[in-house]
Amino acid sequence: MVNPVIFEFIGTSIHNQLNNYVTMVASNTMNMIATTAVLAGGLYYTAMGILMSVGRIEGPFSQLVISCIKFMLIAAFALNISTYSEWVIDTVHNMESGFADAFAGNHGTPSSTIYQTLDNSLGKGWNIAAMLFEKGDNRGLTQIVQGFSELLLSFLVAGSTLILAGPTGAMIVATNAVIAILLGIGPLFILALGWAPTRGFFDRWFGTIVTSILQVALLSAVLSISSAIFSRMVAAINLASATQSTLFSCLSLTAVTIVMPYMMYKVYEYGGILGSSISAATISLGSLAVNTAKSGGGAMTSIFSGSSGGGGSGSAKAGGESSYSAGGNAMWSPAFRQHVLGQFNRD
């Protein structure tokens, strides 16, 4: 039983270096932006609170409080290396290996890293090649033709698997390097989530990471599919049959080897298309709540307006009061309070 650790050895070495890089760069990024972020956030919310209290800005004070709490939560992730490592870096790595295992169809104990998934797929192809090589090597002189055919097929399967696994592994290593760089500068983009004008930077950063994860997972799926195809094609080969051509079997495996790299590049491209549509708006609980409230409010309005009957004046009055309060004309609204106090100061 062949259990190669080629990609795990290479990938783990690179992965350890990238982890050190991520921790160092993320820590340096946090130190660089911490003072600016705290001062800018403090000045922004202080100024907004003062302007709302004197009536220069109209709006509910609760919205400012919620925005301030949201900013503090975001800063807790973006400015603390322990929290960032546990909740962001580890989560991204677990997503990567989890998606790769799921898409590759691995059963039993899941792989600890994406490189172990690659080695598992490579091992399946090489186990088929080893089985064919052993059968061919055990042939006697009277079965030299069958033995030579099995040896040829074993080398073909082993070479085809390596041809597929090699570029796939290289692309995955390159993609992991991109993920490491993005995670290193991630605190800056996570902090950008705190303000609406800069939220688009986080969207693009988050979408690029999800794109890379999907590309790695889809590449693992292609490698697993190619191993399954090799296994089925080799199992269908009967070298002792007088009607089956060894040349045809070799050509079939060669055709699969040519088609699979094209499929690999296509799914890599499709992974980029799928990931580019990811946006932070899709995971915003606030936007979900607003959309739900709007749809529910529209349904309730249609129900009550349809059953109001002759109560038109009462409905209009209630609607007027509702819009009057919703527009900020309440005693806790600074602009409204200033207007009311101004009425008493008239001569």
Swiss-Prot record:
According to its UniProt record, where is this protein mainly located? membrane
The Gene Ontology CC terms held by the record are: plasma membrane
Compartment list: Cell inner membrane
**Pfam families given in the database record:** TrbL
Q: How does it sit in the membrane?
A: Multi-pass membrane protein
Q: What are the recorded Gene Ontology BP terms?
A: protein secretion by the type IV secretion system
Keyword Cell inner membrane found: yes
Q: Does the keyword Translocase apply?
A: no
Segments passing through the bilayer: 32-52, 61-81, 153-173, 177-197, 205-225, 245-265, 270-290
InterPro entries to which the protein is assigned, alphabetical: Conjugal_tfr_TrbL/VirB6
Q: Which UniProt keywords apply?
A: Cell inner membrane, Cell membrane, Membrane, Transmembrane, Transmembrane helix, Virulence
Task: Spell out the family assignment given in the record's similarity comment.
Answer: Belongs to the TrbL/VirB6 family.
> What is the name of this protein?
Type IV secretion system protein VirB6
UniProt organism field: Brucella melitensis biotype 1 (strain ATCC 23456 / CCUG 17765 / NCTC 10094 / 16M)
Q: What is the lineage of its organism?
A: Bacteria, Pseudomonadati, Pseudomonadota, Alphaproteobacteria, Hyphomicrobiales
